[in-house]
Amino acid sequence: MSLQSLYKSVYHRIVGDLPAYINELRAEIFKNGKTFFLGSLLQRTAKRYPDNVALICVDKKITYKDLYYRALRLSELLIERGIRPHDRVFLFLENSIEFYIGYYGIVQMGAVVVPLNTFLKEVELTHILNDAKPVLIITSADKVEHFRSMPAVVTLPILTEQDMRLDEPIPVQLPDFKVHELDSDELIALLYTSGTTGLPKGVMLSSRNCMTNAFQIVSCMQLHHTERILGVLPLFHSFTQSTCVWAVLFMGCTVVLVPKIERRYILGALQHKPTFFLGIPALFGLICLMKNAPLDSVKYFFSGGDALPDRIRCAFELVYRRKLCNGYGLTEASPVIAVDFEDEAGPTNTIGRPVLGVSCEIRDDHGKVLPQGEIGALWVKGDNVMLGYYNAPEQTAKVIKDGWLDTGDLAYIDAKGKIVITGRLKDLIINKGFNIYPQEIENVLMSHPAVIRAGVVGKAADMEGEVPVAFVQVSKVDPGLEKTLRDLCMQHLAMYKVPREFIITTHELAVTATGKIDKKVLRKQLK
């Protein structure tokens, strides 16, 4: 069977298995060639599930009816302040009910929401300000002074949660508000990437992109209005937006928000008995260390955002006797591309099959589609693929060709039609003409019980091109550990893949805001 035929059979099998309510939802969202407008989503859900609890955050709760009214009042305030459709509005808030009010207050009056990474420094924020040219910033009161100290913000109006009229009583009968609907393919959300390869790039998403991926998640997870989703990851992250800001609203689910990734907040949120737990590998590692976290109510655990180490997967299954579902995506695809739900054993870097409506190809350097089992660049296509990079047509042209997106990841398709990620193309190390995939080395290093984190990067070598160097984080430095790790690599890897240098430290390795090892920083440390 050809790869294309294999995907078609998987696609039709999934569609055929969808419950009736999912197919009804699909008919509602994708009607007459037009996609449901993101800005109308909260209004729709507030009418359909007015009394459902939309959000729980520590000791606060809000229903969909009340959330919609708060967002409606913010939309009116933005219009009063002169904000117009298509204007860019920055949203710089941590996980909170106010984030949702800000998000939907922006999009339902037709403006473009720009959710910002709250960990960004002034240099990165200034770059984004100059690139996106927002007309207004919504942030918390304690961040106003920080923004005002930046030259690029001196004249920009700033709203805080104090301007959201949160003390205003909710009327019994909600007032009418005419959502300013944009075309399905117009820009509605501008998400800046974490900048692991340079300054952040603005990923342009349309309603079609957002609603397509939200529906793909609903159909994949088969959500009902009774579900409770544990929202631990930052809301500025594309995965959290797709799952906890868009998808849940289709069904009127409840999001249990964790304001910060701290033990007390996680344990507090678990008291609300969530049914879905979404996280990154490092978070599940933390849950393993807790040993007795109350997880009985959770039906599915999803790990994404980074490669899932065998050690964390096995530890989680051993401690809690539950399976971690592995997933894969990137902001440029809104972001979810594939999910591995099945219970069968397989390598951790297996990310499953594409979600509904996504096509995948493995290509060589010349664009030729490779047969099953061969490693190449992973390309994806679907209505969830971004419009492009903001103000960067040349960069867009490099990654999108004929509707296909180059993910930048190396992968192959196994015999069951599942995608197996082998590493990042940009992280590829070439030694004497041999390709070395850092993730392969990292997986070996992570199998040692003393290793907490491992990151491998290439170092220039005159006669060899590049050689691998391993950064290893441990809790305690053992004098014989370097030899042990070298022997471990020699046992499992070809000699040219064995790191020439081991940098072992008890200090935390640099990570991005989404928890991935920041290899840009590791390369700088080498220099």
Short names for language-model regions:
Residues 274-279, 288-346, 359:
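Gly/Ser/Thr-rich phosphate-binding loop
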Residues 30-35, 43, 51-96, 100-104, ...:
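Conserved AMP-binding/adenylate-forming core of the ANL superfamily
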Residues 211-228, 235-276, 285, 290-291:
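Conserved AMP-binding/adenylation subdomain of ANL enzymes
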Residues 1-9, 14, 43, 80-81, ...:
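Structural core segment of the AMP-binding/adenylate-forming
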Residues 120, 137, 382, 387-388, ...:
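AMP-binding/adenylate-forming catalytic core of the ANL superfamily
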Residues 63-65, 188-215, 340:
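Conserved AMP-binding A3 loop
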Residues 50, 95, 173-192, 199, ...:
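Conserved pre-ATP/AMP-binding loop-to-beta segment of ANL
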Residues 27-36, 164-187:
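Flexible, low-complexity linker/hinge segments
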